[in-house]
């Protein structure tokens, strides 16, 4: 099966304090109307981070600051295998303008399940929620380290693992 390598920008209002995530509804093709994180194919000679910046410039006419890798999603569609590097991003300059998507929404943690995500993108939602759940409550951990910890333990009740005095 053919593998297609892509990137996705999980654009948040602030990488340091995530309260909203930007999502778009695909404006073309088989999955038209399905919700996704903006991004696209990695071109030859490009790093995944460079691809994120280029794709957001092409699709949304803005420049993003690329943060940490959230995860690499491996997903089998009927016709191809998708390998998608997903990065935290925030707008560095410009305003997000829809050049390819048919709609967009800023979603809070509570609203992330309110849209119909594309199959590969939906697999990332629990990890995003885990990182958003504890923002602002961390006092003794570096936010990046804690977010990484939350992602690794997203299938467990994190508050039972970490001493109560941290929250």
Named regions from a protein language model:
Residues 1-21:
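Conserved N-terminal beta-strand and adjoining loop/helix that marks the start
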Residues 160-166:
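Short, intrinsically disordered C-terminal tails of secreted or membrane-associated proteins
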Residues 18-58:
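Conserved Nudix-box catalytic region and its N-terminal flanking loop in Nudix hydrolases
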